[in-house]
C-alpha cells in the first residue's frame, strides 16, 4: 500500500474514515459553498454530479470550489454518470454528446475508442475524475 495513504489514514478519526466512503450527490441548484463545507467538515470522498448540468458557468463554479477543498490533505473525487445517449448529466459547451451504447456498438473499435477518449479528456479538463 502507498505509504502516504497509510500515513493519512492513521490520522483520520473513525468518522472521517467513514466519510471517505461517501460521494455526495450534487445538482445544479446546490451551492458550491454548502457542498465544499460539507466535504470539508465531514471529510467526504467527493461528489457525484446528478441532474442535467447545462450551464457551463455553474458547473465550473462547482468544480472549481470542490477541487480546491482538501480535507485532511485528501483531494475530493468528482464523478458523474456519462454513459451516452440520454444518460449524460453534463450537457455544456465543450463536452460532446456521447452516442448511445447501441450507436457505439455499430462503430468500429477504433472509432469507439476515439469517441470515448475525446469525451473522457473533455470531462477531465473540466475537473471530473470518474
Question: Model-predicted segments: where are they?
Answer:
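Boundary/entry segment of secreted carbohydrate-active catalytic domains
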Residues: 1-30, 83
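Residue-level signal for the start and early helices of compact helical domains
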Residues: 3-5, 9, 13-15, 35, ...
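Domain-core and long-helix interface of multi-subunit machines
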Residues: 24-30, 35, 41-44
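Enzymes and membrane/adaptor proteins characterized by extended Gly/Ser/Thr/Asp/Glu-rich
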Residues: 37-130
Amino acid at each position: 500500500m502507498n505509504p502516504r495513504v497509510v500515513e493519512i489514514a492513521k490520522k483520520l478519526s473513525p468518522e472521517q474514515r467513514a466519510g471517505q466512503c461517501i460521494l455526495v450527490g450534487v445538482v445544479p441548484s446546490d451551492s458550491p459553498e454548502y457542498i465544499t463545507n460539507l466535504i470539508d467538515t465531514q471529510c467526504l470522498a467527493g461528489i457525484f454530479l446528478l441532474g442535467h448540468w447545462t450551464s457551463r458557468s455553474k458547473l465550473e463554479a462547482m468544480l472549481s470550489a470542490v477541487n480546491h477543498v482538501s480535507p485532511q490533505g485528501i483531494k475530493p473525487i468528482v464523478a458523474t454518470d456519462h454513459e451516452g445517449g440520454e444518460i449524460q448529466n453534463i450537457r455544456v459547451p465543450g463536452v460532446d454528446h456521447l452516442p448511445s451504447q447501441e450507436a457505439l456498438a455499430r462503430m468500429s473499435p477504433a472509432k469507439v475508442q476515439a469517441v470515448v477518449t475525446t469525451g473522457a479528456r473533455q470531462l477531465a479538463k473540466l475537473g471530473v475524475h470518474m
